[in-house]
A protein has these predicted regions:
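ATP/NTP phosphate-donor binding region
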Residues: 1-84
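Short glycine/serine/threonine-rich phosphate/pyrophosphate-binding segments
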Residues: 92-99, 120, 232-233
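Non-catalytic interfacial helical region
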Residues: 71-88, 97-112
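Active-site segments that bind and position negatively charged phosphate/pyrophosphate groups
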Residues: 185-295
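Generic secondary-structure signature for well-ordered alpha-helical cores
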Residues: 76, 145-148, 154-161, 169-181, ...
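C-terminal charged capping/lid subdomain of soluble metabolic enzymes
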Residues: 169-171, 270-347
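A glycine/threonine-rich phosphate-anchoring loop and its flanking beta-alpha core
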Residues: 99-191
């Protein structure tokens, strides 16, 4: 597994990292936000020989069409196989940039510099790369590890609150699936005042431990998908609508629904289900789901990559801190779990 570097001085640490890698050219992938907010931190005086390409931010741009633009720019920059791609951005950019690097000339090296809380705790670890296709999340992709991941909590200062909140959902998830004490240590009331550096390090350690035991998701790694079967379906459903949900906001809905399924199917204690419900509703509030939307969300669940044949396979909780995988769930059970969410009252 490639080095994950926690950095309080990203500019110096990146230069030191690059000095140890023999490369022909550097190509920098940024989005319109990170170009303004993050690039100057890394390269205060950026030289023109550093080729760069700017993409539009957001999940809706995580497509093959954007990849083709990136590949065209890489080709125009005459990158050879010794070039290195720097991905400076959130999860969308890292997923797509790594995918582009893996395909270009059968693969060039890349370094991920995640700038959002979500990508620092989650997307930058574990080598899953890809893009959305025909409305399906991460439908096309590969497993490939970056040369290095540079995690600088400093970049979080540039994030809007809603983006911080989105990333916090994955931190909560790591506690729910692997570490009850971690979950209980999270400050839900004043989550904005969290010690992000400490939480990121702990979350990355949890995820790295799981991924190192099962890099290609044959078994144990599936526990990281808790909340994601239903959560991804909501995220995908709302991608085109005006009721746009960030990844973490959608996963928060998914985790409440899947905690209910855990209670029904695995006996997750009612008091723990209540604790999970309370945690997510107090941080994320509640979204309104119309009756007519549920069928479409269910259809999207069926398309999930984790399924085997027509059976929907879920990762569910035996208890907080103990997650298991490959639990078959029927369409009607998913519908019931969404009804449970719909009927919840805010405290």
């Amino acid at each position: 597994v490639n080095p994950i570097l926690f950095s309080d001085h990203p500019q110096q640490d990146l230069q030191a990292l690059l000095a140890n890698l023999a490369y022909s050219k550097i190509f920098i992938l940024v989005d319109s936000n990170t170009q303004i907010n993050c690039l100057p931190i890394l390269f205060p005086e950026l030289k023109t020989e550093n080729h760069r390409f700017v993409i539009n931010p957001g999940e809706k741009n995580k497509t093959i069409a954007t990849c083709m633009e990136i590949w065209a720019a890489m080709t125009e920059a005459q990158l050879d196989r010794k070039a290195i791609l720097l991905n400076l951005g959130g999860g969308v950019l890292g997923d797509m940039g790594g995918f582009c690097a893996s395909i270009y000339k059968r693969g060039i090296r890349f370094i991920n510099i995640p700038t959002s809380l979500l990508s620092q705790v989650d997307a930058s670890v574990g080598g899953k790369l890809g893009v959305d296709f025909q409305g399906l999340k991460n439908h096309l992709g590969v497993f490939n590890e970056p040369e290095a991941v540079l995690i600088a909590p400093k970049f979080l200062e540039t994030l809007p609150t809603q983006e911080l909140r989105s990333g916090f959902a994955e931190i909560i998830k790591h506690g729910l699936i692997q570490d009850k004490a971690y979950f209980e240590s999270l400050n839900i009331q004043d989550w904005m005042d969290s010690d992000w550096k400490k939480l990121i390090q702990h979350s990355v350690a949890i995820k790295s431990k799981v991924v190192s035991q099962d890099p290609k998701e044959a078994g144990l790694r599936k526990i990281l998908n808790f909340g994601h079967t239903i959560g991804h379906a909501f995220e995908t459903y709302y991608l085109d609508g005006e009721k746009h949900l960030l990844h973490g906001e959608a996963i928060a809905v998914g985790m409440i629904c899947e905690a209910w399924l855990s209670h029904q199917k695995l006996g997750l204690p009612a008091v723990e289900l209540e604790k999970i419900r309370h945690t997510f509703l107090s941080v994320y509030g509640k979204i309104r789901i119309e009756e007519k939307e549920i069928g479409l969300v269910l259809d999207l669940c069926i398309q999930d990559k984790k399924n085997e044949g027509n059976t929907l396979m879920f990762s569910l909780l035996n208890s907080i801190g103990d997650c298991t995988y490959n639990i078959p769930v029927s369409r009607s059970e998913i519908r019931d779990s969404i009804s449970f969410y719909q009927n919840l009252l805010l405290d």
